[in-house]
């Protein structure tokens, strides 16, 4: 499995969450660019196909959690999601996308992070990963709020 593959590749304290490609690990390599390249090569060599990767430090995950404008205790946390963009979108695309509306759904773009609040559920929103990829011309991935909180817990455990 992926956990064993990364341990074999030399990564430490490897933990996975719900078999969805969410991994927490420790590495002496500080460059996220190098880590992305190296892990991408390990995965492609083993599985025979490339996958887009997004690597965040534990500190980045904590910051993302703290900055969520919808995590105010007034909104149902099960309706919160975060979309991660692989790069900063062009200003013009950001401006036109910010004006999009859909029912009572809300989103807030903070550089390469999009905070989503979907009161009717993520499955009912037009603000999907594909929507943002298409509108912003980037690669993206979305996680629900619970997953993000669990990844933060795993990252904290890793440091103990």
Language model segments and positions:
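Surface-exposed, charge/polar-rich loops and edge strands
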Residues: 1-20, 24-160
